[in-house]
Amino acid sequence: MKQSKVFIPTMRDVPSEAEAQSHRLLLKSGLIKQSTSGIYSYLPLATRVLNNITAIVRQEMERIDSVEILMPALQQAELWEESGRWGAYGTELMRLQDRHGRQFALGPTHEELVTSIVRNELKSYKQLPMTLFQIQSKFRDEKRPRFGLLRGREFIMKDAYSFHADEASLDQTYQDMYQAYSRIFERVGINARPVVADSGAIGGSHTHEFMALSAIGEDTIVYSKESDYAANIEKAEVVYEPNHKHTTVQSLEKIETPNVKTAQELADFLGRPVDEIVKTMIFKVDGEYIMVLVRGHHEINDIKLKSYFGTDNIELATQDEIVNLVGANPGSLGPVIDKEIKIYADNFVQDLNNLVVGANEDGYHLINVNVGRDFNVDEYGDFRFILEGEKLSDSSGVAHFAEGIEVGQVFKLGTKYSESMNATFLDNQGKAQPLIMGCYGIGISRTLSAIVEQNHDDNGIVWPKSVTPFDLHLISINPKKDDQRELADALYAEFNTKFDVLYDDRQERAGVKFNDADLIGLPLRIVVGKRASEGIVEVKERLTGDSEEVHIADLMTVITNKYDNLK
């Protein structure tokens, strides 16, 4: 394709709010254009890359007998009310109302709709298992869209849904999909690591995320260097081994702590290590207030709280609620209280006595507080985030951290949706049973961004061969010169029969063409320049920067060999 005919609006400067390198490069190279916050158009080069990504996805889905369908993005509220997610999903669900007053949502996911499609059709165990997938735009009303395609309000996803008669069948499809995802990310050029994860608003009993390693990733991966252990930090279990630091029990004292609001400020004020301070936070669990205690250097993990209490209906109490409940602001909370409120403490609080806690009075704290004498803990548990260097639950070593971009996730849903939506089948005994489900997502547009995030240098994008918008970049330095133009035209006609060629025939300065070529990042470049009359051209590899002069008689062989050896 001739570059003069392709819409590639490259930029010299990008908006300052473009934080991620992938966002900057996708804008700068003319692949995407922002419409409004979190919403982008995919221009010709990006569309070609997306087509290559989705072709790989379709191949791998067909390989495991997943059948493609296409469902509407617009979903009626009644389906979401059946599953209970209309109210539970929260403000990220894009809701709208038609002229007749009916409520709809622009789907962020399609569990309800696909369940409604199959519930009257998959009637017998003989029809199972069945796996359906689609590739479609999804919508999420992000509070703060950022990082370009990584966290947008409209995005492209591949979502698949499987239906089973028993858990063994679900296990097999889950493993098939897990392996397919591993192949997909390897084929598109992403270093992605599967990690144990939380199922979030989708629900289910078991899930893995596929994380593309990246410094700008919004998720923290906990992993072992001694085993294949990897988990999202939200799910990484903290191993508790008692290490009591009990000293002689002291008398409780109330001390004045003016303008002290954080654990670190309190530790500095008292001249004590922050891990000897105990923080108190108040949560509402299904409408009931509870206190949760952790040591000063630890952070409460609300995902673990949701898992522990078996509900998603958990939220941190507001400042007004806290003041009304205990008469003090959040920085002064403590477990010594004369109100009926259950107290839960992280396991590691057990290692201390003579605790330092808030006095439930602004400007004051209590020292030498002891469990059993001054207050009681209802239950201990793992309620916090793991720290780097702590022991891992698989006994393989210690926790190491890396940042990652979630590009895919696989879920075992069980009967969460089929039971609430009455999707049943007859088993081999003729008894009605709820369909057992799995769901599996890949962020297609996120994958595009993650590829760029992992495959670039200071000059621009470096496309992997499998997804590159074009295979070769043919550049005529000066098309006004007959020998250069004629040779470039001839090479374009020859190579375009075997490769996808982007032919830069523009009347632009050589520097502009080279800068754009580096920015766009096609794997191989053929430059027709001043030695055109001799039949000599330059061949350059984008990844390594290696270049050589080649006679046109040898050019097809050289290019074919280099292309075959590309990653």
From Swiss-Prot:
InterPro entries: aa-tRNA-synt_IIb (IPR002314), aa-tRNA-synth_II (IPR006195), aa-tRNA-synth_II/BPL/LPL (IPR045864), Anticodon-bd (IPR004154), Anticodon-bd_dom_sf (IPR036621), Cro/C1-type_HTH (IPR001387), Pro-tRNA-ligase_IIa (IPR002316), Pro-tRNA-synth_IIa_bac-type (IPR004500). Its EC number is 6.1.1.15. It comes from the Bacteria. CDD domains: ProRS-INS, ProRS_anticodon_short, ProRS_core_prok. GO terms for molecular function: aminoacyl-tRNA deacylase activity; ATP binding; catalytic activity, acting on a protein; proline-tRNA ligase activity; transferase activity. Its main location: cytoplasm. It is found in: Cytoplasm. One of its GO terms (cellular component) is cytosol. One of its GO terms (biological process) is prolyl-tRNA aminoacylation. It catalyses: tRNA(Pro) + L-proline + ATP = L-prolyl-tRNA(Pro) + AMP + diphosphate. Consists of three domains: the N-terminal catalytic domain, the editing domain and the C-terminal anticodon-binding domain. Homodimer. NCBIfam families: PRK09194.1, proS_fam_II. Belongs to the class-II aminoacyl-tRNA synthetase family. ProS type 1 subfamily. This is Proline--tRNA ligase. It comes from Staphylococcus aureus (strain bovine RF122 / ET3-1).
